[in-house]
Amino acid sequence: MYDGVPFSGKLVKLRLKSNALSYGPIPEPDTEIEQKLEVSVKKKTARLSCYNFGNGAKYLLNQVYVRRESEKDIRDILAMFEAAFSAYEPTGFVCDGGSWELVLTNDKRERFHYEGTLCTDFSWQGESVSDRLRSILDWSKLWAFAPALEEEADAGSKTDDEDTLMWHTNVVREEGKP
């Protein structure tokens, strides 16, 4: 989908589809699997549509959030995307993880297409683009380019060492050896 062209012009609309489907067991029908975000200058809105896995043949629309945003918030979001994708260079692609697809439309109605893995975030002015979007839109569950870290992973741990150990619990042993 990426057409190899950095964004140019004045950004007026963005559409970001984040899909969490990855290698592994089939999700439960009520598991949220896809989010679609649309931000538009013309409508001065941000719209987030959330889809569940359903029966696997077609995702089921679960929730839709539509918010009228201030002109400043819309400008901040679009300026961030203009800057990030004017100098865009593709990053590595992880084939067993989720993915994102982005379409940016400029004031001349030219469309620019980008894609990547749902774990590769971007930085803008030293801040995560995904985190900045979540903050401006006040949608903490927004995935964008990289889902927010789950706070539950840290629950009950007193040190960073305990969190690190969570990732090293699988040990392969030969039968009969301790």
Which residues make up each language-model segment?
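Short, solvent-exposed coil/turn segments at beta-strand boundaries
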Residues: E38-T45, K108
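N-terminal glycine/threonine-rich, aromatic-flanked beta-hairpin/loop signature
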Residues: K43-G54
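Short, well-ordered, aromatic-rich surface patches in folded extracellular/luminal domains
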Residues: M1-D30, E34, G56-P178
